[in-house]
Amino acid sequence: VFTRLFGNNNNHCVYNGDITANGCGKMADFTLKALGEIKKLGATHIWYTGIIEHATQTDYRRYNISPDHPAIVKGKAGSPYAIKDYYDVDPDLANDVPGRMKEFENLVHRTHRSGLKVIIDFVPNHVARQYHSDAQPDGTTELGANDDPNYSFSPYNNFYYIPQAELRAQFDMKEGAAEPYHEYPAKATGNNRFDATPNINDWYETIKLNYGVDYLNGGTCHFSPTP
């Protein structure tokens, strides 16, 4: 189930509308009654899509969540597969943004009380272009913090790079913002696009994670097993 759609009863959504205009389902909408009805359908598990915090055009700076440039967010709500913080949950889904993790824990608890198991998307292939964790545990290094972007591939990097090339996507890089999105050097796009010019049909809102596989030289694996 697409979590942000379940429970959103707005019948007057507008094209390209924001969360104020179009609304958003919440984790709290999965009440014990709702989950019980899902259980009656014969379900044994419920797959909550879009739980992990992902890129969005909703402004949460008042909660110390860094904003995302609109040019690299698909739609206002963003793609649930453009993960922005592996250690946090999507604030759009919470009634109380500062308490969003507790709301998620309560959702898991209600689901289990209803006799259902929980599945959520992990999305290990790629992350949002502006990935930044404000919830990572102490002692954890930010993705890409120790990368050497002078190498298109290094087994010690978290990302793949297009050295000495600025990202020049084949679409509007401002999308209404005061300044265009800037990325230098450009990083490889999530759908294995190893150049600096992704187009609108690519997963342009994401950057590919490097697990030690050198895609540019025959797919040589530098770790065994591959992480």
Whereabouts are the PLM-identified features?
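N-terminal structural segment of carbohydrate-active enzymes
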Residues: 1-117, 125-127, 131-136, 140-150, ...
